[in-house]
A protein has these predicted regions:
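Catalytic phosphate/metal-binding cores of nucleic-acid and nucleotide-processing enzymes, i.e., regions
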Residues: 1-131
């Protein structure tokens, strides 16, 4: 079996999503509620030692916030004040593993940038707590 990977979606003529790949972008239940253009994400770069003006660093901070949201990690209160109001609860590790385990995940993020799909791939295919 091949290792699941992240696939960048494309609007290029003739591009077709691979069979069985799951789209995990923002409008889906798997989407990252922390957009990289949000001021709170830029502020989150500071304690991480990243540059809040750099798109790559902002992508890393957004993915880190997503990981903490999914795994119950803490978000600094000052940063939380700048983040979008999130409705609903994150998917559980069990749901992530059940629905995404072993599957390729698609998002619009460039493959050379950090992405929440990388977080989902790691959690979905982690042996910990697997049923």
């Amino acid at each position: 079996m091949n290792t699941p990977s992240r696939i960048q979606r494309s609007r290029a003529k003739g591009w077709k999503a691979p069979d069985g790949a799951v789209y995990v972008g923002r409008p889906t239940r798997w989407g990252n509620p922390f957009p990289r253009d949000n001021e709170g994400v830029a502020i989150e770069c500071i304690p991480m030692g990243l540059d809040g003006e750099d798109p790559h660093d902002r992508a890393a901070a957004a993915a880190d916030l997503y990981r903490r949201w999914l795994t119950g990690g803490k978000v600094n209160e000052m940063i939380a004040a700048f983040l979008p109001v999130i409705k609903g609860k994150p998917q559980t590790l069990r749901q992530i593993q059940r629905d995404l385990g072993g599957k390729n995940l698609m998002c619009w993020c460039p493959l050379d940038q950090p992405c929440h799909a990388d977080v989902l791939l790691e959690l979905a295919n982690s042996p910990a707590d697997r049923e």
